[in-house]
Amino acid sequence: NQRLLPYHEELKKAGACFGVSGEYERPMWYALNNEKPEYEYSFDYQNWYSSVEFETKNTITNVGLYELSPFSKYEIKGEIAHSELQRICTANIKNEVGRSTYTQMLNEAGGIEADLTVICIGENYFRIISSSATRTHDKAHIIKHISPDLEFKDITDDLICLGIFGPKSRNLISK
């Protein structure tokens, strides 16, 4: 009963070995050199170690593309969206289109309730991305702590999410 990504077949052809995260079947690693993209469990060296090592080294030295679509995604809109996010987030949230801010939301005792990224889509219009594992919790926490005057929408299943990481990521994005 897992959900498939819109480009599932392309990932499969690229050698993806799939696992489940947040209701989605998503790539966990990619097989190298025509190996089978399947887990071979062992108490010894795992068959996927070389693939993950390759991906990690490439990302650290170059650029890596990661499938993050199961991550939770929300939109908040309204006249006071920026001020509400400023109030409930630990970082300074910029109300500037295109700006993204990594931040947390705390509880009354100062403990971390949510670990997320806030992106300004338009004036007083924000997208929030958080972990797939904490979707229900984060959604409830945000709704509980923002004004009911704001428009809140869970858009997790509406959008894909790709992460581009590494020292050459800005060069790739600028092309």
For the regions a language model picked out, list residue spans one by one.
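Glycine/proline-enriched, intrinsically flexible loops and inter-domain linkers
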Residues: 1-175
